[in-house]
């Protein structure tokens, strides 16, 4: 699949997730087979651009793959400025967030709240597309409520404004992440527009990935929550799409290697004073299958030292084996 001048190496994209898809996680997903990774959502508010959190969220020139940054906001000029600053910092694709259902984002008329206001959507898309010379993409939901699904209208508007790829999560804003994603709306959009359409929502395994591609006709898939603690899902899905065969479960030794390497990268990226806190949630996700009684996770979450975290993981896997 192509986005503007960029040819993706496959049809699998790691979704932007606030507080999760930092540089270490993006790099790992790319190594595990994602064709594209997208940064955490960055606010278009210029007052926060110089914060440590914002600087860490920006892409880095030496990152692998096509550097893609997602921005969020409601003011067209601010969004355009945010796009320009990120391109100057190395972004090769700008993604606009109009899919986040979080209340703190929607209260500022950003994220999926914008779907209620097509005129504002048009203004934002036009300003951002005209502000940068890199491809601009858009992520939306199917609408703002089940009785108000307007993704076909927004999709056509996006194509007319110069958006070069569209990701659709198969729920409305009101649905949050409840219930099951629906793919009829994504299929309808794919039949309506000529730009690439990326399906998102509840793609949890290779069989589901194949089914969603076949049903929607989507050009690619975006995978988010299913990659938490399981970044190798991209490799599993790609293998199945290529061969029709399922890979065997990842050996425990490989899980250990990937987890420990990921934790070390988090320690290095955030520094020892913060990295151990960020690592906790990732370790919890990795070990959901292996530590169902939560005892180790509770013990691990009480550790406040980076080196002790790694020692605890080594001991855990030795005992588990």
Swiss-Prot record:
Record SUPFAM superfamilies: FMN-linked oxidoreductases (SSF51395)
Keywords in alphabetical order: Flavoprotein, FMN, NADP, Oxidoreductase, RNA-binding, tRNA processing, tRNA-binding
Enzyme Commission identifier(s): 1.3.1.-
Cofactor(s) listed: FMN
Residues at the active site: 100
Highest taxon above the source species: Bacteria
Binding residue positions for FMN: 16-18, 70, 139, 200-202, 224-225
Family: Belongs to the Dus family. DusB subfamily.
First-level EC class: oxidoreductase
Tagged with keyword Ribosomal protein: no
Entry-linked NCBIfam families: nifR3_yhdG
Catalyzed reaction equations: a 5,6-dihydrouridine in tRNA + NAD(+) = a uridine in tRNA + NADH + H(+); a 5,6-dihydrouridine in tRNA + NADP(+) = a uridine in tRNA + NADPH + H(+)
GO MF annotations in UniProt: flavin adenine dinucleotide binding; FMN binding; tRNA binding; tRNA dihydrouridine synthase activity
InterPro entries assigned: Aldolase_TIM, DUS-like_FMN-bd, DUS_fam, DusB, DusB-like, tRNA-dHydroUridine_Synthase_C, tRNA_hU_synthase_CS
Protein name as catalogued: tRNA-dihydrouridine synthase B
PROSITE patterns, per the entry: UPF0034
Function in brief: Catalyzes the synthesis of 5,6-dihydrouridine (D), a modified base found in the D-loop of most tRNAs, via the reduction of the C5-C6 double bond in target uridines.
Signal sequence bounds: none
């Amino acid at each position: 699949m192509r986005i503007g001048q960029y040819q993706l190496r496959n049809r699998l994209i790691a979704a932007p997730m606030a507080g999760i898809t930092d540089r270490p996680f993006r790099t790992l997903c790319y190594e595990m087979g994602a064709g594209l990774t997208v940064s955490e959502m960055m606010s278009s508010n210029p007052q926060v651009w110089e914060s440590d959190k914002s600087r860490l969220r920006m892409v880095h020139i030496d990152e692998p793959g096509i550097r893609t940054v997602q921005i969020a906001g409601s003011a067209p000029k601010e969004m355009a400025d945010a796009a320009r600053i990120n391109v100057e910092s190395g972004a090769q694709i700008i993604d606009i967030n109009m899919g986040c259902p979080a209340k703190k984002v929607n209260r500022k008329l950003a994220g999926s709240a914008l779907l209620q206001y097509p005129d504002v959507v048009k203004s934002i898309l036009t300003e951002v597309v005209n502000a940068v010379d890199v491809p601009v993409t858009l992520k939306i939901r199917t609408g703002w409520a089940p009785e108000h699904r307007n993704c076909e209208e927004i999709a056509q508007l996006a194509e007319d404004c110069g958006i070069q790829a569209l990701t659709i999560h198969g729920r409305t804003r009101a649905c949050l992440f409840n219930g099951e994603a629906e793919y009829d709306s994504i299929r309808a959009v794919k039949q309506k527009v000529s730009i690439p359409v990326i399906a998102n929502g509840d793609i949890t395994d290779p069989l589901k990935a194949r089914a969603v591609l076949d049903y929607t006709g989507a050009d690619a898939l975006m995978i988010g929550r299913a990659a938490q603690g399981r970044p190798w899902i991209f490799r599993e899905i790609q293998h199945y799409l290529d061969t029709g065969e399922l890979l065997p479960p990842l050996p425990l030794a490989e899980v250990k290697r990937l987890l420990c390497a990921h934790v070390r990268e988090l320690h290095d990226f955030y520094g020892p004073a913060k990295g151990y806190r960020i690592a906790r949630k990732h370790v919890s996700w990795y070990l959901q299958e292996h530590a169902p009684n939560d005892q180790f996770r509770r013990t691990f979450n009480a550790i406040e030292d980076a080196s002790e975290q790694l020692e605890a993981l080594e001991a855990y896997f030795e005992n588990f084996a």
